[in-house]
Structures are given as structure tokens and as C-alpha cells.
A protein has these predicted regions:
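Non-catalytic C-terminal accessory region of glycerolipid acyltransferases
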Residues: 2-6, 71, 75, 86-203
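Polar/charged alpha-helical tracts
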Residues: 15, 19, 44, 48, ...
Length: 203
């Protein structure tokens, strides 16, 4: 799994690279559920290996994601962005206060795909933690027949990475922040494969 991720050729603009790396403080990495495959490489390449904990569904459906993150060298907190339980919220707060990053998929764990749930901002608003919104456009990838059409970029293919930094001061109004962040995530995540790529939704 690690070798697969490291074979990918990430491309980014200087502006996006600055957004990825400008914060020495803990951040919440926010990306759509179908781009989770990239999460470990994002942490390794752009967050200087800072420990990161991913929020994963407490249901049986989240078991495979926990296994994936374990193989990728990341830890998990069981819960969901739609119904963030007290134990999961407390655990994420502790992770941030220990100086580590957290990862959140605002449309997880069961969708609908690209539906930003306000619960995703509970912990970041409470701890005044900035966000890193992640975008990815794949040159060549497979897609699974899952609710989110999960992307599996082909080994050695190019991935065009985007990033937007959202300071904690912009999260105070929950409804306004949810709408603005959702719009930005849609903007930096075009749902298309490059013309030279091959999309196989039948996997």
C-alpha cells in the first residue's frame, strides 16, 4: 500500500504548496470520502510526517478503512462526521491538543456523496483549528462501485493536488462556514479523469 502511494506523481502549484505547508500548528485535513486513498501520502509529503488521526465510521463498514489506515501508518478514531459521538469528539480534541493533525471526510461514512455534513466542523470550531481543504484531479484511475465511487489512482500516474487553507476565524458561523467550505471543496475537486486516463467504474 505504501509503495503504491509513493509511486504516484503529485503535481501542485506554488500557491497550493504554500497552503499545504504554511501551518506548523495542528490542522484538520478535509477531503471527500472517495479521495481517502491519498490521505497517507498527503500527510507524508506535505505535513512533514506529523502524526495524523483519521475519523472512521464506528460501524462494520468502517473496518476496511481502519485496516487501510493501519497499513498506511495512520491511526484512527471511530465515529462519523454526521453523528459525532461524545467519545469520538473528545478523542479528536485530545489529538489536536497533543499537536497532531486530524482527517475528516464531511460526506462520510455513507453519503450522499459530496454532501457536506455540518457535524464535520464540531471539533474544529470547538478547538479553533484551521482547515486544509484537499482537492485532487486524477490523470488515470479506477473507480469502485461504492456509494462514493471511490477513486484508486493507477500506480505511477499523475495526481493534480489542490489545497485551500481556511483559518479558524472563518468557522464561527456554522451554517455560513458549511456552505462556503462545501463550495470550495467542489471547486477544487473536478470529477473527471484526464483524457489520457481510463476510468473503469466496473471494479
Amino acid at each position: 500500500m505504501k509503495l503504491w502511494g509513493r509511486s504516484l506523481r503529485f503535481e501542485t502549484t506554488p500557491e497550493d504548496l504554500r497552503a499545504f505547508t504554511k501551518n506548523d500548528e495542528p490542522v484538520a485535513i478535509v477531503l471527500w470520502h472517495n479521495r481517502l486513498f491519498l490521505s497517507a501520502e498527503i500527510v507524508r509529503r506535505y505535513r512533514q510526517g506529523r502524526p495524523a488521526h483519521a475519523l472512521v465510521s464506528a460501524s462494520q463498514d468502517g473496518a476496511w478503512l481502519s485496516a487501510f489506515f493501519s497499513l498506511a501508518g495512520m491511526r484512527t478514531v471511530r465515529g462519523s462526521s454526521s453523528r459525532l459521538g461524545r467519545e469520538a469528539a473528545t478523542a479528536l480534541v485530545e489529538v489536536l491538543r497533543a499537536g497532531n493533525d486530524i482527517g475528516i471526510t464531511p460526506d462520510g461514512p455513507r453519503g450522499p456523496c459530496y454532501d457536506f455534513k455540518p457535524g464535520a466542523l464540531i471539533v474544529t470550531r470547538r478547538t479553533r483549528t484551521p482547515l486544509l481543504l484537499i482537492g485532487a484531479e486524477f490523470e488515470s484511475a479506477w473507480q469502485l462501485r461504492s456509494w462514493d465511487r471511490f477513486y484508486l489512482p493507477k500506480p505511477f500516474s499523475r495526481v493534480r493536488m489542490r489545497c485551500r487553507h481556511v483559518p479558524a476565524t472563518e468557522l464561527q458561523d456554522r451554517d455560513a462556514a458549511t456552505a462556503a467550505i462545501s463550495a470550495q471543496l467542489h471547486e477544487i475537486n473536478p470529477d473527471r479523469i484526464s483524457a489520457v486516463g481510463l476510468n473503469k467504474p466496473g471494479l
